[in-house]
Amino acid sequence: MLPQIPFLLLVSLNLVHGVFYAERYQMPTGIKGPLPNTKTQFFIPYTIKSKGIAVRGEQGTPGPPGPAGPRGHPGPSGPPGKPGYGSPGLQGEPGLPGPPGPSAVGKPGVPGLPGKPGERGPYGPKGDVGPAGLPGPRGPPGPPGIPGPAGISVPGKPGQQGPTGAPGPRGFPGEKGAPGVPGMNGQKGEMGYGAPGRPGERGLPGPQGPTGPSGPPGVGKRGENGVPGQPGIKGDRGFPGEMGPIGPPGPQGPPGERGPEGIGKPGAAGAPGQPGIPGTKGLPGAPGIAGPPGPPGFGKPGLPGLKGERGPAGLPGGPGAKGEQGPAGLPGKPGLTGPPGNMGPQGPKGIPGSHGLPGPKGETGPAGPAGYPGAKGERGSPGSDGKPGYPGKPGLDGPKGNPGLPGPKGDPGVGGPPGLPGPVGPAGAKGMPGHNGEAGPRGAPGIPGTRGPIGPPGIPGFPGSKGDPGSPGPPGPAGIATKGLNGPTGPPGPPGPRGHSGEPGLPGPPGPPGPPGQAVMPEGFIKAGQRPSLSGTPLVSANQGVTGMPVSAFTVILSKAYPAIGTPIPFDKILYNRQQHYDPRTGIFTCQIPGIYYFSYHVHVKGTHVWVGLYKNGTPVMYTYDEYTKGYLDQASGSAIIDLTENDQVWLQLPNAESNGLYSSEYVHSSFSGFLVAPM
């Protein structure tokens, strides 16, 4: 019986296919009106609205009608006919449903849309404690909490000095302070090297001395020059001259010793500093005190599910939406201490409770991470004086900055944020024990109300006993370094020791002229314009004067401007050089007669600054510097008295290539002179 089922299915399929083919593909075209009903064909009458031309094929020769044969298999489809012209007909009625096709494995369909989330099921039994997960990334900082009530201010022992913070931005220059007490005169430093500053203005003239008595007129010949006398006694210090122009800043000196700590009023609170570099993650803190149980949640209790087997630890998923709080479960076993979580926002202030019993003193916990500074709290009651702290190590002296211009006094700045919270103080005094009330029946859970206003601060408790000093807290963020207001001037110190004698003052002005003396003509006096008599006077040589003293002198002029740097300046135009002790080719004067010489020079400055030096045997004796003013022709000069021995050499030289504006021309002369004052 079973093998005949496929045969019957094939026969039924062939019958259906043949009937369908006869009705669809053997329907005549181009016929209007009702068609005859036959047993073999059934045509549905329809109306053709198109007025197009019906295309018909060529009519063949009609054959004799043969007997009806059995239905054969459907032949292959013929070639497509010529395209017809006409409007599309009306949509036909739906055909009969075909037989069910053979079952086959289809392609997977497009995944459907996610269904609606079902209702939350009941809480299953508490699972086993899973392995400690990796700490998640640090969340963003929460909003600043509402400042709490002012605590009892108890000064603790000062902690150790923290590390030096990063230097803040440069503050505005403060007001000029009062001049300090002059210090002791330091030792004379070594000779510095630098461009000489401008000469200061001439000081005030000294007091006029009394007029001396006029001496009797002397009679006699002029004597020879005497030996130079001993240097005079150091005169009294003159009045200080007016302050000269400010010279260029000198090189930075070494940092001075730390002065004594001053006593001044605390400056106004500076602006809040820039946030410091985030510190490293601290050690995990001790577990906190368990908070009060939250309000009961609202949820439909579901059927308790069966406890499933523990599956493998999956990857940490993303944070889901916050669900409603379920009923309080049974307390489980204490799990392992996890890493400290991020600090949540501060909750609303609760109603102040009654004073509880003082708990035992806990151990000092590790320092927690620095919290965000809260708003400035109310001022607490003054605490007892703490023990004096250990003096901190003196910091390094910073480099001396350039003096800034005194700025206007600014308005007092906004109060800065309070510092980090101090360590937890000791417990207060034991309060009065309260009466335990009777436990009332548990009411139905109410709808959580809106957040109420912040309550007033509670009554401060009695100050407790002074606790042990806590561990030093982490260093706070670096604040903006601002200079505080100048403190009041302290009392004058004791008089210092007598200072060193000052430098001699400037010479005073000349005194009034004395009475005229009597004119007495000495023997051998020669009037102006009168030629001396040569009778009895010996002839003199080029190296010897009239009196028989040796002579050595010269005056030369520079004919070309801007001489070479680092070599003697060759003054090549000679006004006087009879002894030939000066060489115009090299610009060097060579001493032939040992003695005391006087040298002077006068130069012009054009184009840039000039710095000229007088050298003796390659060593500079003195310098002259002139700062050039654009559009002007400046002058500079110098002179010196030098003792020379035989074969000593003296010359002028430009030591610096940046200050070489020595100028000389045909009508603007720069000169160099020297002569023997006294032989030795």
UniProtKB/Swiss-Prot annotation:
| Taxonomic superkingdom | Eukaryota
Report the residue ranges that make up the C1q domain in this protein.
547-680
Keyword Iron-sulfur in the entry? The reply is no
> Does the entry feature the keyword Ribonucleoprotein, yes or no?
no
Give its localization.
Answer: Secreted, Extracellular space, Extracellular matrix
Residues annotated for Ca(2+) 2 binding in this entry: D634
Q: Which GO terms describe its biological process?
A: skeletal system development
* Region listing for Triple-helical region, in residue ranges: 57-519
SMART domains cross-referenced by the UniProt entry:
C1Q (SM00110)
Q: Which GO terms describe its cellular component?
A: collagen trimer; collagen type X trimer; collagen-containing extracellular matrix; endoplasmic reticulum lumen; extracellular region; extracellular space
Record: residues binding Ca(2+) 1: D626, E627, L633, D634
Q: Please list where the region (Nonhelical region (NC1)) is annotated.
A: 520-680
Q: Where is the composition biased (Pro residues)?
A: 137-147, 207-216, 506-516
Signal sequence range: 1-18
Q: Where does it mainly reside?
A: secreted
**Pfam families per record:** C1q, Collagen
Specify residue ranges for compositional bias: Gly residues.
Answer: 314-323
Task: List UniProt keywords, sorted A-Z.
Answer: Calcium, Collagen, Disease variant, Extracellular matrix, Hydroxylation, Metal-binding, Repeat, Secreted, Signal
Comp. bias intervals (Low complexity): 149-169, 268-289, 324-340, 366-403, 426-453
Region Nonhelical region (NC2), as annotated, extends over 19-56
Q: How is it modified after translation?
A: Prolines at the third position of the tripeptide repeating unit (G-X-Y) are hydroxylated in some or all of the chains.
A GO term for molecular function: metal ion binding
Noted disease: Schmid type metaphyseal chondrodysplasia: Dominantly inherited disorder of the osseous skeleton. The cardinal features of the phenotype are mild short stature, coxa vara and a waddling gait. Radiography usually shows sclerosis of the ribs, flaring of the metaphyses, and a wide irregular growth plate, especially of the knees. A variant form of SMCD is spondylometaphyseal dysplasia Japanese type. It is characterized by spinal involvement comprising mild platyspondyly, vertebral body abnormalities, and end-plate irregularity.
Q: Which PANTHER family match?
A: COLLAGEN ALPHA-1(X) CHAIN, EMILIN ELASTIN MICROFIBRIL INTERFACE-LOCATED PROTEIN ELASTIN MICROFIBRIL INTERFACER
Q: What does this protein do?
A: Type X collagen is a product of hypertrophic chondrocytes and has been localized to presumptive mineralization zones of hyaline cartilage.
User: What's the name of the protein?
Assistant: Collagen alpha-1(X) chain
| Species name | Homo sapiens (Human)
Name of the coding gene: COL10A1
